[in-house]
C-alpha cells in the first residue's frame, strides 16, 4: 500500500513536471509566434526604410553633386563671362586713351572716340583679352614685345591684368612674361620688353 502511494506520488510529480514542461513549451511557442513575425516585419520595414534611406541619401548626394557642379559652372561662368566696355587711360604726356583703329595700328588718342572703346573680357582668373568694339580687332603681343591686332583670338591676345597701388592697372602678356602694354608721352606704343610696371607708361585706368 505504501509502495503504491509512493509510486502514485512519484507519477503525479512526474506528470506535474511534464505538464509544467508542456505548458512552458506551449507558452514559449505562443511567445515565439507573437515575437518572431515582428522581427520579420521589422526587418522588412527596416529593409524598406534602409532602401528609402539609401535612396534619400543617393538623391541628396546627386542633388549635392549637381549643386557643386552648378556652383562650379556658375563660378567658371562668372570668371570667364565678365565683359566690361572701358577706355584705358594712360596718364603720360597730355594723357592718352588706348585705341584700336580699323587699320590695326594701335596708338593713343587724347580725345575719346569710338575706336578707344575696348571690351575687356576675362578669359581666365586674372587674365583678360582686349577687343576693339568698333574695329572688331583683338590686341595681341608677340614674343618681341610688339603690339599688333588680329581678328581672331589666340594665346598672344591674353594679358594679365594687375591692380597697382595707385589704382591703375598694368597689362602684362600672359604668354611672354615681363612684357607690358605701354604708351609713350607722345601717344605711341612702346615695346613691351623695354618697360616695367614701375613705369607710368604701363599704367592704365579703366574708364567708362
UniProtKB/Swiss-Prot annotation:
Record's signal peptide: 1-37
InterPro entries for the chain: Fibroblast_GF_fam (IPR002209), IL1/FGF (IPR008996)
Entry's Gene Ontology cellular component terms: extracellular region; sarcolemma
Glycosylation positions in this chain: 45
Record-annotated disulphide pairs: 90-157
GO molecular function: growth factor activity
Major subcellular site: secreted
Tissue: Embryos, adult muscles and adult testis.
Compartments reported by the entry: Secreted, Extracellular space
GO biological-process terms attached to the record: angiogenesis; cartilage condensation; fibroblast growth factor receptor signaling pathway; myoblast differentiation; positive regulation of cell division; positive regulation of cell population proliferation
Keyword field: Angiogenesis, Developmental protein, Differentiation, Disulfide bond, Glycoprotein, Growth factor, Mitogen, Proto-oncogene, Secreted, Signal
Oligomeric and partner information: Interacts with FGFR1, FGFR2 and FGFR4. Affinity between fibroblast growth factors (FGFs) and their receptors is increased by heparan sulfate glycosaminoglycans that function as coreceptors.
Family per record: Belongs to the heparin-binding growth factors family.
Task of the protein: Plays an important role in the regulation of cell proliferation, cell differentiation, angiogenesis and myogenesis, and is required for normal muscle regeneration.
Protein's name in the database: Fibroblast growth factor 6
Provenance organism: Mus musculus (Mouse)
Lineage: Eukaryota, Metazoa, Chordata, Craniata, Vertebrata
Protein encoded by which gene: Fgf6
